[in-house]
Amino acid sequence: MAKPIRKIGLRKGKRKIPKGVIHIQASFNNTIVTVTDIRGQVVSWSSAGACGFKGTRKSTPFAAQTAAENAIRTLIDQGMKQAEVMISGPGPGRETALRAIRRSGVVLSFVRDVTPMPHNGCRPPKKRRV
């Protein structure tokens, strides 16, 4: 299970941020949720690893949900009412993290998938033989 997260004080102090951008980076190994303001300054962030999950448990949907809830807890304290969501990566936690953000009460103006797609660039890794 996830360890209880200790409250970390803000370095810059409280500031009112009415609108922001939530970036979800879902890889196969971890899920990172970063909250920025409109200019791109990071307000808060969380990841499955920072929430106390280790090893293969970091790549679970539940770990992604916990990371999203932790990142959003700080921005609600700072008064964020509206947000845009940018989802990147093919990981298993992308849908669950988005669901956790929707439940938080922040109004989402749009959800955009910004996963980089190659136009036949690098050769992909070989298939695993287990």
From Swiss-Prot:
Protein name stated in the entry: Small ribosomal subunit protein uS11c
Coiled-coil ranges per UniProt: none
Annotated localization: Plastid, Chloroplast
GO CC annotations on file: chloroplast; ribonucleoprotein complex; ribosome
InterPro entries per the UniProt record, alphabetical: Ribosomal_uS11, Ribosomal_uS11_bac-type, Ribosomal_uS11_CS, Ribosomal_uS11_sf
Keywords of this entry: Chloroplast, Plastid, Ribonucleoprotein, Ribosomal protein, RNA-binding, rRNA-binding
GO MF term set: rRNA binding; structural constituent of ribosome
NCBIfam families hit by this protein: PRK05309.1, uS11_bact
